[in-house]
Amino acid sequence: MFSYYGSKSKIVQYYPSPTCDKIIEPFAGSARYSLRYFEKDVLLVDKYKVIVDIWHYLQRASEKDILGLPKIDIDFDLSKHVYLSEVEKNLIGFLIADAQSAPSKKLTKKWFSLRPAKIEHRIKGLIDLLPKIKHWKIIQGSYENLKNENATWFIDPPYQFGGEHYKESNKNIDFNSLANWCKSRLGQVIVCENTNATWLDFYPIIRMKGANKFSTESIWTNFKTQYDSIQQDLFGRGNKKECVNVA
């Protein structure tokens, strides 16, 4: 699987399980939540065309296509592979570095020497996911334009503090408007942030170490979870909405 800045790959198991048949990720990125529950009806949405194109490529790709990508070793130079399509170059750019917000243009020997098996592991991960995502719907777009429907909404936007590194960054987000939008969703709503955020009443779920510091991941949800505190239960977080399956 490819690495992406802000991915929930290490902590996805701590988020509430989906209670609806459909999952919608309006800020999809590497879509680790949907991958965990891949058999669901999944809609991925992202404004960043590079990410959407990579997902479309993977949806169409075969194992042969993935294995046909150039071998990546310590001397790998992406610029020499001029025959690759733009989307293949971008996919490889996310394979040869960790937690990037845009595809890397080159592999560093230091990174590779410290992680000699990582590329092979990621290639295997890509092959494993190919049959899992054939039924998904993937579109380029913005959350504001999505139909409100009964679903598990896994909302992981660029963070209020720290989300400036994305190509489609937090600078273009009105967080008050986003908060109201999240509260109005039908079904189950799970919103990701860290504890510095102020635009919803987030509460912590796990503390984790980043490259240079610790941070605490938090969530807001319209369903009761094991992370709820007594104070939050007393003050409430709005109306609870049950999932409704519509034929």
List the predicted regions and their residue ranges.
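S-adenosyl-L-methionine
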Residues: M1-Y37, A247
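Hydrophobic "anchor" residues on beta-strands that sit immediately upstream
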Residues: D21, V42, T152
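Anionic group-transfer/hydrolysis microenvironments
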Residues: F27, Y48, P158
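Short, polar loop motifs at secondary-structure junctions
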Residues: F27-R32, G125, V191-A197
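Short loop/helix-cap segments at secondary-structure boundaries that form the rim of catalytic
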Residues: S34-E39, N145-E149, T195-Y203
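Class I S-adenosyl-L-methionine-dependent methyltransferase module
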Residues: K40-K137
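Active-site segment flanking the S-adenosylmethionine/decSAM binding pocket
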Residues: H135-K171
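Long, positively charged, glycine-interspersed low-complexity recognition regions
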Residues: K167-A247
